[in-house]
Amino acid sequence: MIRFEMQSGDTIDIELYPEEAPKTCENFEKLVREGFFDGIHFHRIVPGFVIQGGDPTGTGTGGSKQNIPGEFRAAGVDNKISHEKGVLSMARSGSYTYGFDTASSQFFICLDDSCKALDGYYAAFGKVVDGMDVVDRIASVPTDSGDYPRMVTDEILIRRASII
């Protein structure tokens, strides 16, 4: 289980599903152990869809130094996790037809079941089991026209990520 301790003092607990996406879970846990997510904020907020984090630059273009293989149907992996509310999935470069192995450190959390259109094209690998109210508060932070938060606040800043 992963815990995001937000700068606001709130927490988000996420259960991982290595039986569906073992390489993705292994990579995510490694990044947590290394402190990679500490001090990073949720840089993209799309109300009714997703909140996205894991980019050390905060621009949507950064990541870790290592890409991982896509663990989803379009990449040849039978991942049965559906992108429903609370599901954790890897963001990646590319589209529905290319860039399958470009996931690195950026991730998103689904805000509702409208994310099911992503099934088979993005590696879902966990689910929020406690703190969905925190996720929903993050989703309500004001954004600009590019879905970026207008300012980095304690509500969207991950103070520390840990394995619990």
Give residue spans per PLM region.
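Cyclophilin-like peptidyl-prolyl cis-trans isomerases
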Residues: 1-164
